Amino acid sequence: TIMYRPTFNFSKGNSNSGNFSETLNNESTPINRKEATNHQTNDRFSTNGSLQLNRKLNSKGRNIALRLYYDLDDGNSDRYSLSNTYYLKYGDSIKTLNQWIEKLDKNNKYQVQITYMEPVFTNRFIEINYSYQHRSSLSEKYAYDWDKQEDTYSQYPDTAHSDCYKNKYSTHQTGIFFRTIRTNYFYNIGIE
């Protein structure tokens, strides 16, 4: 028996936002205020699925099964952020931050599981299984400052506002079980 069940998803979107904040002193006099606007576009693709193969080896219940599972998720976005911070306490001054922020996210997972079942008595079986799972994640964010001289965003990222990380890990798991199957009940005893 072979069964394969995949799913796919794709999405696109964009958003605009703005905010205003103000800091006051004890006399309720503004000491600074901040105005910010953001425009963002993003798209994401994800897919997952499972493939299962079952092989019956005899009529008494001996069989072997293989199951493969995967889950993949990729997303990226572009955000244009402009903020002006006005410092009012010691005379008027302004700090402007104009950035293009590029972000990438990847999350992957796959698992392989094999199960063998051997009949030992009537309606009683020994099951042995093994599974291997691997996960990985990647996140990259690069922020590019506006270059007034070039009248465009810098080709080099601003390290103070950029970051990236990558994680990987794997797990192995095995187990053995004694299984009893009756018309009105069943039970498992085992370790893994």
What is each stretch, according to the model?
Residues 1-192:
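Primarily recognizes Gram-negative and organellar outer-membrane beta-barrels
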